[in-house]
């Protein structure tokens, strides 16, 4: 979820309280506390760290009390002895923990995936109920904050909207998934891993992704749906990344392992020549491949046109690899494909690892484990 929505949700939560510290800092501090978990980006310097840290430990349920404590210490005006109607420190701590939980809620209902079980698991929770930027969620919150004076009932309604609207999206997602499965089953198609994603203006537009086995291999299909779950455009087809290949690459590289855990139904295509390594590896039969997933697109033509206008518009999250048959490299008989070089590039944030040698996964140190690094 975008930071404006996070901050607005915190402001609404504070304004909905019947009693709050009588300081002009009360609402801004609540807004900042609700947006604060995204400060994990401050500690990111490489694409791999972006995948491991963003929506990572600062979004973890286990770390929530600690982050809440740090935020409570920063919210000194709320528990300062000279503040009229001040709260005790424990109450401020409870508030900041609630703001962190509110942030986590608004992230898990999107499609990105949030690692709420760190440091015990890197599993990403995604409920696929709300598009990553949803004006139907954000604008009512901003309007309520603007009209807040002596309107606590309005604030309570806005706070309820923070939960009711995303929860409704999650329910609609489940309904659309059941509709799509029934339709494809009636067409006698061999599909698996069907996933419904919210599109822009998601109560009215959705996207369905699924894998389909065909004689020429496994494909990933994508189709835009209307509010009634009916297809509104022809399917688009992409070559699925073979699971055996992704597993082999994951065993050979912590970068590949992390990327494929992040993706949803990854697809594969030959790499564009301009993105290939400048210096050849010299290995016979080497080939360059691009992996990505389809979560961050849209089935709406006007939305795609808007997305194409953003600076450095491209596939948002890309894994490029140079691979060769294992027999082309002596002593590499344990895998069908040998990973020679790799590159992570995230176009929107302009993060690029450039071509580098893979690093084999290893058990993390205690410090790395605690913060979710590998």
Model-derived features with residue positions:
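A short catalytic or substrate-binding loop motif that flags glycine-/basic-rich loops and adjacent residues
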Residues: 199-203
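N-terminal membrane-targeting hydrophobic helices
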Residues: 1-198
